[in-house]
Amino acid sequence: MPAHGESAGDELTAVKFIAAIERTLARLAPVHAVIGHSLGAAMSLYSVAHTGGANRVALISAPSSLKRELNRFAAAVGLSDRGTAAFIASVEAHVGRPATDFDIRGIAGKVDLPLLLVHDQNDRQVPVLESARNAHALPGAELMVTRGLGHNRLLADPAVVRAVVDFVAQETPTQEMMGSACTI
């Protein structure tokens, strides 16, 4: 991801995030499964919904709404209501699209593939309610809720890793298992 971790760049917007994921999916095609964490999970599902770039997706600690995440961030840094509105308007102007364009509820109709949602009940960064909303918006999605692992530790939890590996290892009924698994 640009401007993420050790990657080059000084800015990561939702549009750049999605473009990077879509380039990765195209380069690795065919992709059997995508595994995403946090905002990477939501942006991965958005990308797959618009490109058909994978046969199945595992979403770990995924927010259901970018706008709600922006509101949470604004509250965490102490912005007033007016400051929050200005912050969100600035982000939307910079990205060139309303934050609600990236909501999982809005893309649910474009997603017809196996989905695994994993979230910890004690996640303080992205509340578990977000995965409950995602499960409601994405009929047929399997929801696994853990306890006591928070936002990041669940990534290394043996039971979570096993559930994700088992999910990824399954063949999708309409397509042969081939290609790569892509972790975002």
Give short role names for the model-derived ranges.
Residues 1-6:
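Conserved alpha/beta-hydrolase
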Residues 50-97:
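Hydrolase active-site cap/lid region
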Residues 110-112, 117-119, 123:
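Short beta-strand/loop motif that positions the catalytic acidic residue
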Residues 136-152:
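Catalytic histidine neighborhood in serine/cysteine hydrolases
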Residues 35-44:
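Gly/Ala-rich beta-loop-alpha elbow adjacent to hydrolase catalytic centers
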Residues 149-161:
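Catalytic histidine-centered segment of alpha/beta-hydrolase-like enzymes
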Residues 113, 127-136:
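Short alpha-helix in the alpha/beta-hydrolase fold that links the catalytic acid
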Residues 9-32:
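Alpha/beta-hydrolase active-site loop
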